[in-house]
Amino acid sequence: MVLSAADKTNVKGVFSKIGGHAEEYGAETLERMFIAYPQTKTYFPHFDLSHGSAQIKAHGKKVAAALVEAVNHIDDIAGALSKLSDLHAQKLRVDPVNFKFLGHCFLVVVAIHHPAALTPEVHASLDKFMCAVGAVLTAKYR
């Protein structure tokens, strides 16, 4: 997935609005994913999946950090997330469709917290970005 210059600007603009809320949004994204797509819980059998659990917050922080890292290296997402791609493909063996679920839930969280920022153009750019992140995280499955 190739991001245009406008896409990159839009994605960076959204993440500048997210700012210090990235960890909170990461946890909220996971909570939404676990509820909307309960099959994703199978990768977290050892987690307390209740609302506001410390484990969801901690993993949400990791998700947020990875997304921020991808934004900070938007011209080399594959390089920025290479180790994470290895982890998910070789050790965790996460079903690739789960990255699509995560991306969708992240878009919902952004829409809830920043409705004015999520214009149709920004929505499309953010969706392309999340697809690019998902593609990187599943690239080493082959």
Curated annotation (Swiss-Prot):
Domain named Globin: residues: 2-142
GO cellular component: a single term: hemoglobin complex
Residues the record lists as binding heme b: H88
Family: Belongs to the globin family.
GO BP annotations listed: hydrogen peroxide catabolic process
Organism: Anas platyrhynchos platyrhynchos (Northern mallard)
One Gene Ontology MF term: iron ion binding
Subunit structure: Heterotetramer of two alpha chains and two beta chains.
Cross-referenced PROSITE patterns: GLOBIN
Binding site residues for O2: H59
Organs and tissues of expression: Red blood cells.
Protein name as catalogued: Hemoglobin subunit alpha-A
Protein origin, superkingdom: Eukaryota
Keywords: Heme, Iron, Metal-binding, Oxygen transport, Transport
Classification via InterPro entries: Globin, Globin-like_sf, Globin/Proto, Hemoglobin_a-typ, Hemoglobin_oxygen_transport, Hemoglobin_pi
Function: Involved in oxygen transport from the lung to the various peripheral tissues.
